[in-house]
Amino acid sequence: MEKLKVHSKFEPKGDQPKAIRSISDGILKGDKYQTLLGVTGSGKTFTMAKIIEQVQKPTLVLAHNKTLAAQLCSEFREFFPENSVEYFVSYYDYYQPEAYVAQTDTYIEKDASINDEIDKLRHSATSALLERKDVIIVSSVSCIYGLGNPEEYKNLTISLREGMEKDRDEILKKLVEIQYERNEINFVRGTFRVRGDVLDIFPASSSNIAIRVEFFGDEIEKIREFDSLTGEIVGKRNHVSIFPASHFATSKERLEVGIKKIEEELEIRVQEFIKEDKLLEAQRIKQRTNFDIEMMRELGYCSGIENYSRILDGRAAGTPPQTLLDYFPEDFLLFVDESHVTLPQVRGMYGGDRSRKDNLVNYGFRLPSAYDNRPLKFNEFQSKLNRVVFVSATPGDHELDKSSNVAEQIIRPTGLLDPEIIVKPIKGQIDDLYSNINETIKNGFRVLVTTLTKKMAEDLTEYFKEMNIKTRYLHSDIDTIERMKIIRELRLGEFDVLVGINLLREGLDIPEVALVAILDADKEGFLRSDRSLIQIIGRAARNSESKVIMYADNITKSMDRAIKETNRRRVIQMEYNKENNIVPQTIIKDIREVIEATKVVEEEAEYDSLEEAIQANNENLEELISKYEADMRKAAKELEFEKAAHYRDIIQKLKKQLSNI
């Protein structure tokens, strides 16, 4: 097995060595729950990486949204270039769940758009877990949803080895059984093609590398890897495992047993409806279920097969579904990032799913077994865990109560202090804020302003614009990608002030911000709790010149706790800096990193101009041309003809450049 090994030019500093040692010892000793309480900018991700290196366990890192998961995955890939770092989030670009509105007699069919790249990354994650031990998976709460039986997934895997006696047609049948499609023309992920004694398979977990199996009679003579686009042979394999193209793939034997049980449940349900004089519902459930059964018999699957997953898995009613957690070995390690947000999210998933399914079951659209195609309940989630580390600057009561060890990470490697907090009266707050904004902008820095209401945020934005301050408003209707673009523009200085409500909290790392203003800080509530205030204060902890202004007429209990905690941390940080002769330095962070979090993790860097691309690849222009040709074909295939034409123009310029060399 490859060892999990961190590659970094940095060594642990400040509180990091103590936190790494303390939590690693706890994991190896058998502590189930621990907390890493790390302030913003203290290098919690690096600490997590070093703990993983110390304990050498397959690891799941749980984040509360796709953007944060992508950002973490990117960082872990830099720390562990020799190991398998995977990304597992929901593969839906768009998802409209199946539902029934009884009041208007409206049935809403499930409608979804699946992101092929993310589906590939999900398959890559599960296959990595079954093939190796040096695995780190960064996931959203998608990991607590049903994923199919890992034992069945493993049993259906096709193992091919050089010199093996294997009937070619038998392999083709098995490929179809695990939901690969035969396609001689459009050779894409999850398909295979046959040309004489040569079988080409495009694994569901691969981007562009396919497998070529060459036969001599019934003997496998050669197994090679090739580029699916160019056909160029890129490697030789002695052995290859082909994992199913769907996590819900089921063997014929299990499918037949499952169909009989579905028919039995259907018969019972129809009789129940007839007994209650619900003839329409009885007819509906019979028609819909029989159609699904017919599809399963003919194709091996049906649309919405996940609703029958409990029966196909052979589980008892009410038992938890199989999830990504079941693909891990028993001794895996879980990090819950931003646990104060992530854990409540995990808690809330089951309730929302159950209420939606009530109508579908009660009105004859689904069998009662559909209830068991669901996310895990919180207690079920906890029962699957073995070693857990909660990671947060503001851990919740649940985390602190559960943890046998809380490791504090208050010292930042850069020497940065928690910001100074100034409390000012509400009267005249806008004029005072205007004056502070001008001073901050004059020094070349940016400003974050957080309000309590949407109307105030909008009015404030308009007011500052009228006062010739470049201001933008970040509201909840803005999607993730647009949000990251706005943050990038703030960092670049395209505007100076960003106004928001509850959007200036976790994951907003902007070193250019030197002032955070909190309006109506004395209004007790969720947005002004001590934990929320500490998170907002943390947004100013990346700049050595930063300060926080709270506008309030009274010091609330939440404000008092947040101010005291921040001052406690400042004292510890100042003493450490004095003892070690450290001068606080503003974090220097590449601006491109902010927007890269929204891309699929494996994407290659785009160049800002053709000249930059040529300069970066001057010795490999032919490779660059091949890359753009692949991009052009992909764009044309997706009917994005303007983009394809743009790539064509680039290719022509590159070829001209090549001829001049």
Curated annotation (Swiss-Prot):
One GO process term, biological-process aspect: nucleotide-excision repair
Gene3D superfamilies: P-loop containing nucleotide triphosphate hydrolases, UVR domain
Keyword field contains Transport: no
Keywords per UniProt: ATP-binding, Cytoplasm, DNA damage, DNA excision, DNA repair, Excision nuclease, Nucleotide-binding, SOS response
Protein name: UvrABC system protein B
Binding positions (ATP): 38-45
Residues of the Helicase ATP-binding domain: 25-412
Localization (cell): Cytoplasm
An annotated Gene Ontology molecular function: ATP binding
Gene name for this UniProt entry: uvrB
TM helices/strands, residue ranges: none
The family this protein is said to belong to: Belongs to the UvrB family.
Positions of the UVR domain: 622-657
Swiss-Prot/TrEMBL domain comment: The beta-hairpin motif is involved in DNA binding.
Organism superkingdom: Bacteria
InterPro entries: Helicase/UvrB_N (IPR006935), Helicase_ATP-bd (IPR014001), Helicase_C-like (IPR001650), P-loop_NTPase (IPR027417), UVR_dom (IPR001943), UVR_dom_sf (IPR036876), UvrB (IPR004807), UvrB_inter (IPR041471)
Motif stretch (Beta-hairpin): 91-114
